[in-house]
Regions:
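Intrinsically disordered, low-complexity Ser/Thr/Pro-rich tracts
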Residues: 1-26, 33, 39
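Ser/Thr- (and often Asn-) enriched beta-sheet segments in non-cytosolic proteins
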Residues: 2-8, 58, 104-108, 155-157, ...
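Solvent-exposed, acidic/flexible segments
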Residues: 11-18, 30, 67-72, 85-89, ...
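N-terminal lobe/hinge region of extracytoplasmic solute-binding protein
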Residues: 23-26, 31-101, 131
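Surface-exposed patches in mature extracellular/periplasmic domains of secreted proteins
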Residues: 33-34, 140-145
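N-terminal short leaders/motifs
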Residues: 41-63, 107-120, 199-219
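Aromatic- and charge-enriched surface segment that lines or borders ligand/interaction sites
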Residues: 95-140, 159, 165-167, 175
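Surface-exposed binding/hinge segments that line
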Residues: 145-229
Length: 229
């Protein structure tokens, strides 16, 4: 079983931010950085020295098929691979633990996480993605790998605002590794992650918006499914 290990790094007492964000804070259009972060933010270990804002980022590409290369620096997943390429470390989830037979995995989310518009990021965003998007065959006829187990399919259950369980019909000790690769960075596949911003995306579903077809037509789409995707 691949273990999700805690990263032993010192929690900063103060935080820095990009100059453009600092200007927005000074202008009063953005809260201070400390108020935008969760109570236990993820802190990555430093390799060499702490970087500086600005400059040029150069990436090495493996060839024409390496189109997702540029997105790897911005990917976000439930857990992520450590620098050794083997161990898994926390990310969106501060912990991800299985039961004794690997059929149930419990994800503890970081308290106080927010979406880019400042709205809370909670277990409700997982439930929206699972119930209204992934289990909607019009939007997701082929289910994402992180929820599959052979011919069966797992389910997502909210325990509380910061706790989610992934329940499978059998042993699934590879779930953590698969979850570490489930992100939407490459080509915007928003159904390949366990969450979605429910507060924003609900407006594009007929379940929550009776005028969604008119919204799709106004945007030049054939129907609401194209608008959503």
């Amino acid at each position: 079983v691949v273990k999700v290990v805690e990263v032993e790094v010192e929690k900063p007492q103060t935080y820095s931010e990009a100059p453009g964000l600092a200007q927005a804070v000074s202008a009063g259009s953005l809260p201070p950085v400390g108020e935008r972060l969760p109570s236990d933010p993820m802190v990555m270990p430093v390799f060499g020295s702490i970087g500086k804002y600005g400059g040029t980022l150069r990436r090495g590409y493996l060839g024409p098929q390496d189109g997702c290369n540029m997105f790897r620096v911005s990917r976000t997943s439930l857990v992520r691979f450590a620098a050794d390429g083997f161990n898994l470390i926390p990310s969106v989830a501060k912990s991800l633990t299985p039961n004794s037979d690997g059929s149930v995995w419990t994800a503890k989310l970081r308290k106080g996480m927010k979406w880019s518009d400042g709205s809370p990021f909670t277990a409700d965003d997982f439930m929206f993605q699972y119930e209204d998007v992934i289990m909607n065959d019009e939007l997701t006829p082929s289910k994402p790998p992180f929820l599959k187990l052979g011919d069966g399919l797992g389910e997502v259950v909210k325990i509380d605002e910061t706790t989610v369980e992934f329940r499978f019909p059998g042993q699934n000790f590879l779930f953590a590794e698969i979850a570490a690769q489930a992100d939407e960075a490459c080509y915007g596949n928003t159904r390949n992650v366990p969450w979605a911003p429910a507060h924003y995306m609900k407006q594009f579903l007929p379940k929550y918006n009776s005028d969604v077809d008119a919204l799709a037509e106004a945007g030049g789409f054939e129907d609401w499914t194209q608008l959503y995707l």
